[in-house]
Amino acid sequence: ADRRHSRVAERIGGNFPPVVISDRSNGDFEFDHASQPDYIYIGKEDPENLPDNFRLLVDAHFWKERPNAYPFFIASEIDELKDYSVPLKFIRLTYRDLTDRVIEVLKQDKSVIVILSTHHRNGIAAERAAMHHLLAAGCDVPVILHRDYRETDIEALQLKAAVDFGTLLLDGFGDGIMLHNEGCETMVTDSCMFGILQATR
């Protein structure tokens, strides 16, 4: 399927290849240089503790202005987006958060990227519904597909993630992916994401 048209913010969206965002909020900063993620989510960690060349997502209230560090918001913080003038802002939303008012903010603020999350039993359907909702509203915000797992078995994680992400990517949805898993090393999760993107190119 053709990829959904999204605007470009920095190098996310448009015709840029989908990005990988690695969730390192657990404080694990070991990387496999063969599969270096495009962005790293560090949660409440102090961005000063990491090298400048890492592009970091930092929880908005812990964010500090420095090269390559971007604030990460949750749905309840939508009204705070306007207080930050940075080239990129990330906000984690679910399908249910996409009210008319929220969509209006996403349309107006061209620096925003949505991290689309789901707690729904049928996550694929929920994320697909969210993408169709954005399309119907004429909202071209770039969207990163996000999933949470609790898998200790690497193969089970790979299979589950390949279906959950791959189905939507092959439908033309998603300007990147972000996978959080309790149970495996973070480098395993990263290589799983790179594998999914290679398989869906």
What residue spans do the PLM features occupy?
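Active-site loops and adjacent core secondary-structure elements that bind or stabilize anionic groups
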Residues: 1-78, 82, 88-95
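Catalytic alpha/beta core domains of metabolic enzymes, predominantly
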Residues: 7-13, 67-70, 76-79, 85-201
